[in-house]
Amino acid sequence: MARYIGPKCKLSRREGTDLFLKGRGRSLDTKCKLDKAPGQHGDRRARLSDYGLQLREKQKLRRIYGVLERQFRNYYKTASRMKGSTGENLLQLLERRLDNVVYRMGFGATRAEARQLVSHKAIQVNGQAVNIASYQVQPSDVVAVREKAKKQVRIQDSLTLAEQFGFPEWVEVDTKKMEGVFKSIPERSELPAEINESLVVELYSK
């Protein structure tokens, strides 16, 4: 199954919230009516059942991190076998994806752009090039832009903007060297509050 490459607004309208797929500081314009679902009858957004709410939350989480269904289900299975809260484990596994860490460190303006940088071998981990977007970054790992890619204007622009917005507590970034340290796995309290991972757990627990 191919990745969705259509309008970002359509995905956000489907979920009824801005998924921030357009990058830092670029919220959806006013033409994107988040209170209406896409399609001819979008103004008649149906009241969802419990199952519908669970499904929508799963789709929202998948789309935020850009993960396909089979891979997302595998993340859930892994999370359910780990100690602690399955929902928190799931979010932490998604946050530890290399493409997400590249995005969090500001090397990519969006997760999609970060994924492209990884696949094009523009990123290295602990001095070694890694081109697998799903690679699980470990605490203390050093993630950096490879020397040959440091002149890319899009990376420079993204870093400048990210520095203005600030970096998450669990990463430490040296913008001049274009490298960062993944200091620790983020706690649930440090992650977006608008995600209700318990609905995803309920969905897959059936």
From Swiss-Prot:
<dbReference type="InterPro" id="IPR018079">
    <property type="entry name" value="Ribosomal_uS4_CS"/>
</dbReference>
<dbReference type="GO" id="GO:0003735">
    <property type="term" value="F:structural constituent of ribosome"/>
</dbReference>
<feature type="domain" description="S4 RNA-binding">
    <location>
        <begin position="96"/>
        <end position="157"/>
    </location>
</feature>
<dbReference type="GO" id="GO:0019843">
    <property type="term" value="F:rRNA binding"/>
</dbReference>
<comment type="similarity">
    <text>Belongs to the universal ribosomal protein uS4 family.</text>
</comment>
<keyword id="KW-0694">RNA-binding</keyword>
<dbReference type="InterPro" id="IPR005709">
    <property type="entry name" value="Ribosomal_uS4_bac-type"/>
</dbReference>
<dbReference type="InterPro" id="IPR001912">
    <property type="entry name" value="Ribosomal_uS4_N"/>
</dbReference>
<dbReference type="GO" id="GO:0015935">
    <property type="term" value="C:small ribosomal subunit"/>
</dbReference>
<dbReference type="InterPro" id="IPR002942">
    <property type="entry name" value="S4_RNA-bd"/>
</dbReference>
<keyword id="KW-0689">Ribosomal protein</keyword>
<keyword id="KW-0687">Ribonucleoprotein</keyword>
<dbReference type="Pfam" id="PF01479">
    <property type="entry name" value="S4"/>
</dbReference>
<dbReference type="Pfam" id="PF00163">
    <property type="entry name" value="Ribosomal_S4"/>
</dbReference>
<keyword id="KW-0699">rRNA-binding</keyword>
<comment type="function">
    <text>One of the primary rRNA binding proteins, it binds directly to 16S rRNA where it nucleates assembly of the body of the 30S subunit.</text>
</comment>
<comment type="subunit">
    <text>Part of the 30S ribosomal subunit. Contacts protein S5. The interaction surface between S4 and S5 is involved in control of translational fidelity.</text>
</comment>
<dbReference type="InterPro" id="IPR036986">
    <property type="entry name" value="S4_RNA-bd_sf"/>
</dbReference>
<protein>
    <recommendedName>
        <fullName>Small ribosomal subunit protein uS4</fullName>
    </recommendedName>
</protein>
<comment type="function">
    <text>With S5 and S12 plays an important role in translational accuracy.</text>
</comment>
<dbReference type="GO" id="GO:0042274">
    <property type="term" value="P:ribosomal small subunit biogenesis"/>
</dbReference>
<dbReference type="InterPro" id="IPR022801">
    <property type="entry name" value="Ribosomal_uS4"/>
</dbReference>
<dbReference type="GO" id="GO:0006412">
    <property type="term" value="P:translation"/>
</dbReference>
